Amino acid sequence: MKFDFLQKQTSRREMLQGSTTLAGSVLLAHLLPATLLRGSAMDNAQRAPSPAALLAIMRGKFNAVPMETQKLADTITMFDGPGGAVTVLNGPDGKFVVDTFVAPAWPRLKEALDGLGSAPVKYVIDTHWHFDHADNNAHLHATGATVLAHENTTKRMSEPHDLPVLYRGADGALASLHFDPSPAEALPQQTFATSYELRANGETFALQHVAPAHTDSDIYVHFQNANVISMGDLFFNGMYPYIDPGTGGTITGMIAAADKILSVADNHTKIVAGHGPLGNRADLTKSRDMLITSRDRVQKLKSAGKSALEAVAEKPFADLDPVWGERRRQRRPARAPLWNLDTTNLRNSTALAGT
């Protein structure tokens, strides 16, 4: 066999100095793509749909997004579209696929993978547990691929979850998606705790877990020879991120993850975002700086004794919304709910900012 797998039992990355979370920090929660929950009869609804109905709508909306193909290196291709971005290392040793789109996009994903050549998919790498990244695990495993992820991805996919989202209907109501435990065939067959290294197709690629950021299951994949980094939802390029506090996400962790990746990227690194266009070091730096600004503004309001409603009334993101809230399409002004991130549980602060 032409590839080898070297599992490195390196020490866990040091936790952030001081507090790793910030009570009252802002969760800039916008589910993607930009117009995901706009349009259709939902805009006239008085209440958000049921979690099951909302999930079906979400998958359908994601699946309506066209898929685009972009060559990143001789052996690396990015598919951008129905559920974010998929990165593929392809060569005589087989295909190594990072993330998998949403379930309804499987026929298109399969066609795109087949279009890269006849080599089989050897490994599927989940950057975290969310459905728009791991929905097609079972399909790919059925073709003979091994699904590889951080151990918390298996943990989270094995549990029921209610994932809070910002419903973008007429009333901007807070809603949630419900997930039952995933079937056994969709779960990763191989996991790691801290880091893992693969070598194939002339490439060395390192998988690295980070402290809780978007979730507690996040990893990034660094294709070292090609100078490509696939970040999953540790990076939303040009837009406010979605942070999942119910499974460990924190804005402080997102900042720390960006800092970690900036420390290994250079000015020529191609950075695949979980959502948004292909990025680079400058794009990631801008996103990191926006998160720092957002966190610090909310902390200042909290330290001044403002309640969540009072903080929202201050419109702390008025100058950020036109840049980060507009994303890639014209739409309503962004709305950002305030959350407490001092625990992994969602706090009861559902006030919305914006007009």
Annotate each predicted stretch with a short phrase:
Residues 71, 94-95, 102-104, 154-210, 216, 225, ...:
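Metallo-beta-lactamase
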Residues 3, 14-21, 308-355:
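C-terminal regulatory/interaction regions
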